[in-house]
C-alpha cells in the first residue's frame, strides 16, 4: 500500500510539472477552407505556460478561424492542434476560458444567475461558486449590479462579466478576443493587471487585439497572420530588433540646414527631426558627424519603430506578395 501511495504521489508530482516544460498549445500547419475561400493555410505556432501570446492580424486575416480550430469548433482540413499535451477532450475544454469578440451573456437573466450557470457548465460545485463568485464580482466592481439583467448593463460591465465567466473556473488557458473593447481607462488597467496576474500564476493567455499599444505592454511573444498565412512571429523584443533601423530622432537648439554630411534624408517632426544615415553609417558615427558640423543637440536617440508601424509594414509587404 505504501509503495502504491508513493507511486501515485510521484505521478501527481510529475503531472504538476509537465505544463512548465512543454507548450500548452501547439498549432501545426493547420489549414481550413470554406468552399472556395481558404481561411487559414499552413499556420503554425506554439504558446507556452506563463506567457501572454498575441494573435494579431487585420480583419478577415484568419485569427478567428484559427481560434475556432484550437477550440475544436472547426475541424482543420489538414494539420493538427495539441492542447495540454494531446488532442482536445471535454475535460480539456473545461481547462480553457474563452471570450469571443461576440459577447455571450444571456441578456434576460440576472448577471449572478448567468455567471452561476456558466460556472456550473465548467464543472464548478455550488460550494466553489459560492466562494468564488462574490470575490470576482467585488474585484470587477460589479457587486451592486449582480441582480441586474445583462441587457441593463453597460457594454463595459458586460465585458467584465464575460471575463468573470472565463476565469472563475481557474482555467489553464485563457483565450480572449479584443479584451479591452468598451472598457474605460480604469477598467482597462484592471484587466491588464488581471492578465499579468494570470501570467504570473503560470497560465497560458492568448490575446487577440487590434490595440498594438496593449500588445507592446503585455505580450511576451506574438504571431501576425494575414490572408490565412503567418507573416511574422517571435518574441516581442526579437520583432523590434528585426525591424530596427539606424534612423535617429534628434532635438537641436537651432533649425537644421537642408543638407548634412552623413545624412541621406531629413524629416521634420513635431519638435524635432528624424534623420536617416547614409549607407554604411551607424547611429554612433552619425552623432560624431553631427557634432563635427557644429550641430548643437538637446537630445539624440535611435528611432525604434512602434508595433503599429511594424504591423502596417509587414501586412503591406504580405499583400504585395498576394497581388
Per-segment meaning from a language model:
Residues 2, 9-12, 28, 41-44, ...:
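N-terminal non-cleavable signal-anchor helices
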Residues 98, 120, 138, 200, ...:
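Residue-level marker of structural boundaries
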Residues 1-31, 317-323:
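ABC-family P-loop ATPase nucleotide-binding domain
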Residues 245-318:
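Short, charged/small-residue-rich alpha-helical element at the C-terminal edge
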Residues 23-25, 32-226, 232:
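ABC transporter nucleotide-binding domains
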Residues 192-278:
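ABC transporter nucleotide-binding domain
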Amino acid at each position: 500500500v505504501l509503495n502504491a501511495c508513493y507511486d501515485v504521489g510521484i505521478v501527481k508530482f510529475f503531472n504538476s510539472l509537465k505544463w512548465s516544460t512543454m507548450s500548452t498549445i501547439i498549432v501545426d500547419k493547420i489549414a481550413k477552407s470554406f468552399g472556395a475561400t481558404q481561411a487559414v493555410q499552413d499556420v503554425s505556432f506554439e504558446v507556452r505556460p506563463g506567457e501572454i501570446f498575441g494573435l494579431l492580424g487585420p480583419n478577415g486575416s484568419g485569427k478567428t478561424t484559427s481560434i475556432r480550430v484550437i477550440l475544436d469548433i472547426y475541424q482543420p482540413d489538414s494539420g493538427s492542434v495539441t492542447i495540454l499535451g494531446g488532442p482536445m477532450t471535454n475535460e480539456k475544454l473545461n481547462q480553457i476560458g474563452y471570450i469571443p469578440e461576440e459577447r455571450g451573456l444571456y441578456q434576460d437573466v440576472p448577471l449572478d444567475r448567468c455567471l452561476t450557470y456558466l460556472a456550473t457548465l465548467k464543472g464548478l460545485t455550488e460550494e466553489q461558486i459560492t466562494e468564488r463568485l462574490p470575490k470576482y464580482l467585488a474585484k470587477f466592481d460589479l457587486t451592486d449590479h449582480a441582480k441586474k439583467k445583462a441587457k441593463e448593463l453597460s457594454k463595459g460591465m458586460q465585458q467584465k462579466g464575460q471575463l468573470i465567466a472565463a476565469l472563475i473556473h481557474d482555467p489553464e488557458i485563457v483565450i480572449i478576443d479584443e479584451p479591452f473593447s468598451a472598457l474605460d481607462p480604469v477598467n482597462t488597467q484592471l484587466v491588464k493587471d488581471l492578465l499579468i496576474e494570470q501570467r504570473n500564476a503560470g497560465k497560458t493567455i492568448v490575446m487577440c487585439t487590434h490595440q498594438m499599444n496593449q500588445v507592446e505592454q503585455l505580450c511576451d511573444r506574438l504571431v501576425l497572420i494575414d490572408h490565412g498565412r503567418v507573416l511574422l512571429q517571435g518574441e516581442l523584443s526579437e520583432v523590434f530588433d528585426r525591424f530596427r533601423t539606424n534612423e535617429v530622432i534628434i532635438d537641436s537648439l537651432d533649425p537644421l540646414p537642408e543638407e548634412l554630411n552623413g545624412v541621406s534624408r531629413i524629416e521634420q517632426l513635431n519638435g524635432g527631426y528624424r534623420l536617416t544615415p547614409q549607407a554604411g553609417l551607424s547611429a554612433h558615427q552619425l552623432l560624431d558627424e553631427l557634432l563635427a558640423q557644429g550641430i548643437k543637440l538637446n537630445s539624440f536617440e535611435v528611432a525604434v519603430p512602434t508595433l503599429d508601424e511594424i504591423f502596417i509594414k509587414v501586412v503591406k509587404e504580405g499583400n504585395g506578395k498576394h497581388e
